[in-house]
Amino acid sequence: DDCLNLRKGIYYIENLLLSDCKDKGINVSYNSKANIENLLLKNSTTAIYAKDSSDIYIKNAILKNIEYCIASYRTKRNYAGSKVKYKNINYCPESKKIKGEGSVINN
């Protein structure tokens, strides 16, 4: 149900278009690092989701028809929280962010 699942790695992605993701647009997990620049994401429950010791940096994103723009969690005890840092997202108010204990979301 996710468009892009990134696990246990380091990723650099430019010019990404994702559409009609049922659950998550981008899901980064299990101690991964993802740098994403120039993202267009449409029709998803959660646009950007980090979990379990993962870090995401997003620069230049356009999000359309999403329920939550960013979520950052720890779901497994053997991992720490996650971090999402972003710059220039068209629409991401605090009410559209979900942050779990020990996780960080900032711009």
Predicted regions and their residues:
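Extracellular beta-rich repeat passengers
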Residues: 1-107
